[in-house]
């Protein structure tokens, strides 16, 4: 049986005090978590505190996003890869692609630069998010959108992709809405992604995640999808009891 990865994207749900409390409680579940593959994505301001509090060797910590510049640079509010000691970084989440208030939308070209920087940095693995909006889904454009988003993975990125890159399919219309595609719909999209990856990064071992309203009530149903290697979970992962229930249902 393959090991399923649980990536907990806490977004802005937990402040530093909440994050520390969460990890302290998590440390008490050493036996349950011993054979699990877990990644925590706290807010940038909480990463150091989470790492200092964590005592579980198999739980890694990552950033929710990074700036396109890896070196110190005059970018107000930016966070570079060099500034924080992390194991993973999320790139291209829809909340950075589409929902920035000032409309500085991360386009596909910028996403390509970011994921390449993450993988080329050394020692950091990337989770690259793709997915369609509801309008695109209703127009039957899901594959076209994902094809365009994946296209940036060619070139330099393929040199670093093997065992360092994960693709997370997150339909934008499912994130935080409680609406989840059917297992068949998810499987069809993941199969398409795998097909495209075989062309873009031939021979690379790249995992496939699903994200979008995943919780303790639907995780078992989603686990029936053979193509899924893990889950990128938002709101439910920031609620300790829900998170533990998800972990218990993984195997």
What are these regions (language model features)?
Residues 1-251:
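Active-site loop-to-helix "anion-binding N-cap" substructures in soluble metabolic enzymes
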């Amino acid at each position: 049986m393959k090991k399923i990865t649980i990536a907990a994207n806490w977004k802005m749900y937990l402040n530093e005090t909440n994050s520390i409390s969460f990890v302290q409680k998590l440390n008490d579940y050493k036996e349950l978590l011993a054979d699990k593959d877990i990644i925590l994505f706290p807010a940038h301001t909480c990463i150091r505190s989470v790492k200092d509090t964590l005592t579980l060797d198999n739980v890694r910590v990552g950033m929710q996003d990074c700036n396109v510049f890896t070196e110190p640079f005059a970018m107000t509010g930016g966070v570079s890869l060099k500034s924080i000691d992390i194991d993973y970084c999320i790139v291209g989440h829809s909340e950075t692609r589409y929902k920035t208030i000032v409309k500085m939308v991360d386009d596909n070209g910028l996403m390509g630069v970011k994921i390449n920087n993450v993988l080329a940095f050394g020692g950091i693995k990337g989770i690259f998010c793709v997915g369609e909006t509801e309008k695109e889904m209703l127009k039957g454009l899901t594959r076209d959108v994902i094809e365009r988003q994946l296209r940036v993975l060619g070139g330099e990125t393929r040199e670093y992709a093997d065992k360092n890159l994960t693709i997370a399919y997150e339909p934008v219309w499912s994130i935080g809405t409680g609406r989840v595609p059917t297992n068949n719909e998810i499987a069809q999209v993941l199969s398409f992604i795998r097909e495209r990856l075989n062309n873009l990064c031939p021979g690379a071992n790249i995992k496939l995640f699903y994200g979008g309203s995943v919780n303790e009530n639907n995780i078992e149903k989603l686990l029936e999808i053979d193509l899924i290697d893990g889950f990128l979970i938002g709101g439910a992962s920031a609620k300790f009891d829900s998170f533990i229930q998800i972990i218990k249902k993984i195997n």
